């Protein structure tokens, strides 16, 4: 709910009194506590640059996306930083102490299952501990919204699904985070100096398997399927190794980057909700997103959950779906 003008004025006066001089809003409308489509409270902090920001651990249970200032606060309080950008970008600078990771190191390697998480939970646990993931420490994931593939959202979706409920991505990615006076380095680290202690406690709310998707498609009860790929892929192009082209019948085309502005920040919440309404996405639907290998759709799932939607990522996505029988895994070309 929005604060009154009087309350806002008092807040600004008090801020000035303690030396906080810069208040700027990010794309989710400052000083608001957005409601989700079902009127349950979702805490999305919205202060982009402020000298003092406090993020409570309880807030992160529902908040999957943070502003650069909130990320800075979390990092200064000891959060683990995972950098999912490409190596060339990392060479030009990383947050000091960040660990360079890729979504592939936590995923299966054999076609057509490259989008799915490792089946061996012991191996997956060890990989996460090696990069410094602790059960009781926040994890801040840094990506490249403009030039990447939504790897930061994929990483957040993965860790949340595996039971780490203090994992967040930074709105605006590395470029935005580099503007909030954090120490930087050009040294690339791929393993933490102190291994983490994370234990997987899987949460099924945000994932769906191929078999479950087939079942849901047969009834389509309260189901919306979103194709997070480019329009050309939706229409049948196969630039990334899919066995067959097209899209899942009834899917809505929504390229995930439609939710970003020219600087890589998320669009204002109101605009995202309007965009979803225009694509005929009901507020109370269960939304299943897919792409090629669950990366772009993982990002979209993270954003949708942060907004308060019931959202699931089909990690197998088109690599797996298109490799299945055409009689079972139908595709539409147009």
Residue ranges and their predicted role:
Residues 4-7, 39-42, 47-55, 119-207, ...:
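Thiolate-centered catalytic microenvironments shared by cysteine-dependent enzyme domains
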Residues 6-22:
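Gram-negative bacterial Sec-dependent N-terminal signal peptides
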Residues 19-49:
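Signal peptide processing junction and immediate N-terminal pro/mature segment
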Residues 43-80:
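N-terminal module-boundary/linker segments of secreted carbohydrate-active enzymes
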Residues 54-64, 74, 175-249, 326-334:
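Active-site neighborhoods of enzymes that stabilize oxyanions during catalysis
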Residues 71, 80-85, 101, 225-227:
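Short hydrophobic beta-strand that contains or immediately precedes a catalytic carboxylate
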Residues 108-139, 256-286:
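Helix-loop module immediately N-terminal to the HCX5R catalytic loop
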Residues 272-274, 282-334:
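C-terminal soluble interaction/assembly domains
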């Amino acid at each position: 709910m929005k604060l009154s003008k009087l309350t806002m004025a008092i807040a600004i006066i008090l801020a000035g009194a303690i030396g906080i001089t810069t208040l700027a809003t990010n794309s989710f409308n400052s000083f608001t506590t957005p409601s989700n489509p079902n009127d349950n409270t979702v805490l999305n902090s919205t202060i982009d640059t402020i000298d003092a920001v406090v993020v409570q651990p309880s807030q992160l249970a529902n908040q999957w996306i943070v502003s650069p200032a909130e990320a800075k606060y979390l990092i200064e309080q000891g959060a683990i930083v995972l950098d999912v950008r490409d190596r060339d970008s990392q060479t030009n600078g990383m947050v000091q102490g960040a660990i360079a990771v890729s979504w592939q190191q936590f995923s299966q390697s054999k076609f057509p299952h490259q989008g799915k998480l490792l089946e061996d939970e012991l191996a997956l646990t060890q990989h996460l501990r090696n990069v410094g993931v602790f059960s009781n420490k926040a994890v801040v994931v840094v990506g490249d919204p403009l030039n990447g593939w939504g790897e930061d959202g994929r990483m957040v979706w993965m860790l949340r699904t595996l039971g780490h409920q203090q994992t967040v991505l930074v709105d605006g990615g590395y470029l935005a985070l580099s503007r909030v006076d954090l120490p930087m380095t050009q040294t690339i680290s791929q393993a933490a100096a102190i291994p983490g202690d994370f234990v997987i406690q899987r949460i099924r709310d945000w994932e769906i398997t191929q078999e479950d998707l087939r079942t849901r498609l047969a009834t389509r009860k309260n189901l919306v399927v979103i194709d997070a790929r480019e329009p050309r892929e939706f229409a049948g192009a196969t630039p990334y190794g899919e066995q067959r082209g097209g899209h899942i019948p009834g899917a809505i085309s929504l390229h995930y980057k439609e939710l970003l502005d020219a600087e890589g920040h998320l669009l204002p919440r109101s605009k995202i909700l309007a965009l979803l309404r225009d694509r005929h996405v009901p507020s109370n639907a269960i939304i299943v997103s897919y792409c090629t290998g669950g990366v772009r759709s993982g990002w979209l799932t993270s954003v949708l959950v942060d907004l308060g939607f019931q959202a699931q990522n089909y990690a197998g996505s088109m690599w797996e779906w298109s490799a299945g029988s055409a009689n079972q895994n139908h595709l539409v070309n147009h």
